[in-house]
């Protein structure tokens, strides 16, 4: 590597000049370990190295960082460094061209940092705003969660904007959406921005003034809604959490929310989901990149594990909703409906979590294709409106940048400004600033075979936990030595002992969205109307339908929060069928895999990550299949 790699192929040292990048791409069964070597740079400074913005710790805390599962990443250094690399990679090199990390991407981070500081100042200066925000989720005009589609028109709300009453631009951190074609580096940029936010020297607090006193008077009840002056009603667990929060008041770093709108990513928790992941600088101020199976780090929802892994970057489980498709374009109407519910959950969090509010949103999106231009990028417009996006970043796509500028034309702003956006029913939404950034030269084109392997790995990891190098990693039948850092599972995900359980057909309520295929309306008999739409929920009947039994076998089911509290042992969750919106807006509690169907005994055998009672008997099926081989 340009004469700057030393040592054997198993252990070698790589010298990184200032503002350089060491890139590697792993193939199946390849593993790599990297550590930052102690010492000084040629200019006498302390060395530094980071991966997607996550700092590699050196000095007295020197440690090895493992990588596997076909990971593709880059080690960047601002001041220069020497790293030691163990293992082999099919592709590894020092980038010759300058990386945008040191110019455009870091400038974008500084732009977002200014907006976060402005939001913090606004919250500190307006104590009354905190009370208004906290009480907004209790406003009778605000649509109750999971009973009515947030954008549904009602008699009392003909404009369909009641769900947006909780939104206020004041004290709101940046809401940035990353756009670009497939394999443009969108997720990598999202991780870099999130890691830089977590590592920021800023303190995401309300300070010691009147605003802090008002926030102190707000308490969280057992139902997750904020009530004023509820100290006496706090459980012991909530009081303990409060004391821990007080200790964290001076912790540096922002608390952003990462939203994943790409259902093919599978992170978190699995493919076919849309998720909002609240981050915090504790326990670790970074999102690990050990495996592409955990694009945003590890958490209980990602792995099915009860305790978080040792390398968990965050202790808060994501809000995940089930889309049921890996490609949003297969049912874009349903995608928009799920996006509305996810955005509503984010707004509710921002109304009660002031750290997250001032830290803002970072939104990852699916790759834009040519066909999206035919309907004027309708899904992008809907997401911008739903999440009140104020900054759109376009990666490496000149035409898309021009199209976004036309759709959301507005001057760049650095203060809170609002404007009516077409189709917003008169809502005052933030002006949108469109920014074009270059694509990194290290971006790797991913084929469908790789994506299929990654999806299978994500599902397997959910049920079985992480994997180690172990003796299965052999060379000519001789086990290879375990690399540093690979004695534990990648990402700190613990190994699990999945458990099979048998459930009667009539006990598990399973729904799907629409039919697999719909005949055109013109093919229907004269005067007849369609009974099932592409957004309507259909309850499966495996007892009487052989087709439903076939569709269930080998499928992965999303277990959702029972809409009406759930039934007791041996009882279904619902005495009457819930509404579509009660199912669509319900958060995912976990997943089960349908391993077997017994048509004679009318029972279904499902695999869960661990033994114990299932968290729900209400499930949704989609296109996610997996065979446990």
Curated annotation (Swiss-Prot):
A Pfam family annotated for this UniProt entry: CLP1_P
GO biological process: mRNA 3'-end processing; tRNA splicing, via endonucleolytic cleavage and ligation
Residues annotated as transmembrane: none
Keyword set, alphabetical order: ATP-binding, mRNA processing, Nucleotide-binding, Nucleus
InterPro entries registered for this protein in UniProt: Clp1 (IPR028606), Clp1/Grc3 (IPR045116), Clp1_C (IPR010655), Clp1_C_sf (IPR038238), Clp1_N (IPR032324), Clp1_N_sf (IPR038239), CLP1_P (IPR032319), P-loop_NTPase (IPR027417)
Gene3D superfamilies, A to Z: Clp1, DNA binding domain (2.60.120.1030), P-loop containing nucleotide triphosphate hydrolases (3.40.50.300), Pre-mRNA cleavage complex subunit Clp1, C-terminal domain (2.40.30.330)
Primary subcellular site in the record, as a coarse category: nucleus
Annotated region described as Disordered, given as residue ranges: 142-166, 562-582
Polar residues biased stretches: 148-159
Subcellular location: Nucleus
Entry's Gene Ontology molecular function annotations: ATP binding; polynucleotide 5'-hydroxyl-kinase activity
Annotated positions binding ATP: 21, 72, 183-188
Key word Nucleotide-binding present: yes
SUPFAM superfamilies reported in the protein's UniProt record: P-loop containing nucleoside triphosphate hydrolases
Gene Ontology CC terms: mRNA cleavage factor complex; nucleus
Matching PANTHER family: CLEAVAGE/POLYADENYLATION FACTOR IA SUBUNIT CLP1P, POLYRIBONUCLEOTIDE 5'-HYDROXYL-KINASE CLP1
HAMAP family: Clp1
Family membership noted in the UniProt record: Belongs to the Clp1 family. Clp1 subfamily.
Function: Required for endonucleolytic cleavage during polyadenylation-dependent pre-mRNA 3'-end formation.
Complex and partners: Component of a pre-mRNA cleavage factor complex. Interacts directly with PCF11.
Protein name per UniProt: mRNA cleavage and polyadenylation factor CLP1
Organism expressing this protein natively: Mycosarcoma maydis (Corn smut fungus)
Gene name of the record: CLP1
């Amino acid at each position: 590597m340009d004469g700057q790699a030393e040592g054997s192929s198993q252990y070698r040292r790589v010298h990184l000049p200032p503002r350089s990048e060491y890139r590697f791409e792993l193939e199946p069964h390849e593993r790599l370990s990297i550590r930052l070597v102690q010492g000084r740079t040629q200019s006498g400074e302390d060395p530094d190295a980071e991966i997607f913005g996550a700092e590699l710790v050196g000095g007295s805390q020197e440690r090895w960082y493992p990588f596997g599962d076909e990971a593709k990443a880059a080690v960047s250094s601002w001041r220069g460094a020497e790293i030691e690399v163990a293992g082999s990679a099919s592709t590894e090199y020092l980038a010759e061209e300058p990386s945008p990390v040191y110019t455009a991407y870091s400038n974008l981070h500084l732009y977002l940092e200014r907006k976060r500081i402005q939001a913090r100042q606004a919250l500190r200066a307006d104590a009354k705003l905190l009370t208004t925000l906290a009480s907004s989720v209790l406003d009778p005009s605000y649509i109750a969660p999971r009973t009515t589609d947030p954008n549904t028109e009602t008699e009392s709300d003909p404009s369909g904007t009641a769900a947006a009453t909780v939104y206020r631009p004041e004290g709101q951190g940046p809401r940035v959406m990353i756009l670009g074609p497939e394999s443009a580096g969108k997720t990598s940029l999202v991780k870099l921005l999130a890691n830089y936010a977590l590592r920021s020297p800023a303190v995401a607090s309300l300070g010691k003034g009147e605003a802090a006193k008002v926030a102190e008077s707000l308490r969280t009840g057992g139902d997750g809604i904020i009530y004023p002056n509820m100290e006496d009603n706090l459980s012991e667990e909530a009081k303990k959490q409060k004391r821990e929060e007080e200790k964290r008041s001076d912790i540096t770093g922002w608390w952003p929310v990462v939203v994943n709108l790409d259902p093919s990513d599978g992170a978190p928790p699995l493919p076919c989901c849309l998720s909002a992941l609240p981050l915090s600088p504790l326990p670790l101020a970074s999102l690990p990149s050990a495996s592409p199976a955990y694009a945003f780090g590890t958490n209980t929802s990602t792995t099915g594990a009860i305790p978080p892994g040792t390398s968990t970057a965050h202790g808060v489980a994501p809000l995940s909703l089930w889309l049921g498709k890996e490609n949003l374009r297969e049912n874009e109407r349903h995608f928009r409906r799920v996006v509305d519910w996810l955005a509503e959950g984010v707004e509710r969090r921002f109304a009660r979590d002031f750290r997250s509010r001032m830290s803002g949103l970072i939104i990852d999106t699916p790759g834009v294709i040519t066909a999206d231009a035919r309907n004027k990028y309708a899904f992008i417009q809907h997401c911008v409106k739903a999440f009140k996006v104020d900054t759109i970043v376009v990666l490496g796509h000149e035409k898309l940048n021009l199209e976004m500028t036309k759709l959301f034309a507005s001057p760049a702003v650095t203060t809170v400004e609002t404007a009516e956006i077409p189709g917003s029913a008169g809502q005052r939404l933030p002006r949108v600033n469109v920014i074009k950034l270059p694509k990194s030269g290290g971006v790797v084109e991913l084929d469908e075979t790789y994506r299929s392997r990654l999806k299978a790995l994500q599902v397997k990891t959910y049920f079985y936990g992480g994997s180690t190098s172990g003796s299965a990693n052999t060379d000519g039948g001789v086990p290879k030595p375990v690399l540093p850092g690979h004695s534990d599972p990648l990402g700190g995900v613990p190994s699990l002992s999945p458990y099979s359980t048998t459930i009667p057909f009539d006990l598990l309520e399973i729904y799907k969205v629409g039919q697999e295929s719909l005949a055109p309306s013109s093919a229907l008999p004269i005067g007849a109307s369609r009974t099932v739409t592409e957004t309507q929920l259909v309850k499966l009947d495996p007892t009487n339908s052989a087709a439903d039994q076939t569709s269930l076998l080998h499928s992965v089911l999303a277990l959702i929060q029972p809409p009406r509290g759930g039934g007791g042992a041996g009882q279904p969750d619902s005495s009457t069928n819930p509404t579509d919106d009660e199912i669509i807006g319900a958060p995912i509690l976990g997943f089960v895999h349908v391993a077997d169907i017994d048509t004679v005994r009318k029972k279904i055998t499902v695999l869960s990550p661990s033994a114990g009672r299932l968290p729900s008997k209400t499930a949704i099926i989609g296109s996610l299949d997996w065979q446990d081989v």
